[in-house]
């Protein structure tokens, strides 16, 4: 099992859902505000904002919160956020990419570096691990959206590149630059997605044992709890046996 989506599910089952939900809304709002500030405040005229709003809706973010985040971009006192990417190695030599939106680069860099160091890893230079990943668009649908065959048909028609259907849902991937168009066509066929975003997909995987898997989980958790961190990606691969033990 590659990546860390299953680990996030494990963590959520162990509690803190409300706190995590609030933090997710805060990060979604920040992305909406930044997108609105960089372009037009109308999602129809701003591809990045349209995706941000679609993703917020998919996460059940209240409409008022979305509108407030858009309006905030036109205010005189709106914070200036920089988009920053950090790269490094976590436990077991696992490559990790961290994306952040921050109004204080020094604070965020210090927090991210501390998280890597505490886990036994090390923060590297930009480009030190991203060559092991490929930037793509990812659209997630819940299982009820359709059968594996119907999802595949819709994805092919929309111009997607790959589909993975499992018990937990359907993952549709496409070229990074086509995410807006593909997600729009899929919405017309399947309804609103559960998640729409660009992701770093690992092209090289690092197998890990149970001990290293737990260490990576702690690192990812620490990073994702930082208000400035938007996304975390890692190239670890864990066996189904270990995953089952962690899920117990």
UniProtKB/Swiss-Prot annotation:
GO terms, molecular function: DNA binding
Family: Belongs to the TACO1 family.
GO biological process, one term: regulation of DNA-templated transcription
Organism per entry: Bartonella quintana (strain Toulouse)
A single cellular component GO annotation: cytosol
NCBIfam families hit by this protein: PRK00110.1, PRK12378.1, YebC/PmpR family DNA-binding transcriptional regulator
Keyword field: Cytoplasm, DNA-binding, Transcription, Transcription regulation
Main location: cytoplasm
HAMAP family xref list: Transcrip_reg_TACO1
UniProt cross-references to InterPro entries, sorted A to Z: Integrase-like_N, TACO1_YebC-like_2nd/3rd_dom, TACO1_YebC_N, Transcrip_reg_TACO1-like, Transcrip_reg_TACO1-like_dom3, YebC-like
Protein name listed in UniProt: Probable transcriptional regulatory protein BQ11790
């Amino acid at each position: 099992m590659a990546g860390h989506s299953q680990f996030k599910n494990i963590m959520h089952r162990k509690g803190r859902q409300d706190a995590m939900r609030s933090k997710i809304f805060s990060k979604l709002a920040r992305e909406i505000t930044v997108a609105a500030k960089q372009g037009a405040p109308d999602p129809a005229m701003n591809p990045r904002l349209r995706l941000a709003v679609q993703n917020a809706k998919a996460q059940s973010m209240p409409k008022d919160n979305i509108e407030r985040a858009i309006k905030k971009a036109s205010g005189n006192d709106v914070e200036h956020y920089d988009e920053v990417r950090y790269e490094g190695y976590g436990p077991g030599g696992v490559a990790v990419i961290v994306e952040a939106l921050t109004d204080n680069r020094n604070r965020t860099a210090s927090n991210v570096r501390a998280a890597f160091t505490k886990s036994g890893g090390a923060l590297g230079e930009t480009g030190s691990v991203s060559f092991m990943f490929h930037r793509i668009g990812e659209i997630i649908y819940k299982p009820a959206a359709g059968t594996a065959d119907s999802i595949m048909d819709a994805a092919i028609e929309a111009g997607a590149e790959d589909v993975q259907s499992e018990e937990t849902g359907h993952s549709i991937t496409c070229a990074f630059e086509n995410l807006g168009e593909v997600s729009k066509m899929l919405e017309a066929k399947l309804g609103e997605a559960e998640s729409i975003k660009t992701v770093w997909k690992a092209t090289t995987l690092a197998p890990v044992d149970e001990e290293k898997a737990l260490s990576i989980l702690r690192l990812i958790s620490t990073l994702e709890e930082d208000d400035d961190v938007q996304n975390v990606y890692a190239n670890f691969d864990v066996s189904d046996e270990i995953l089952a033990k962690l899920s117990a």
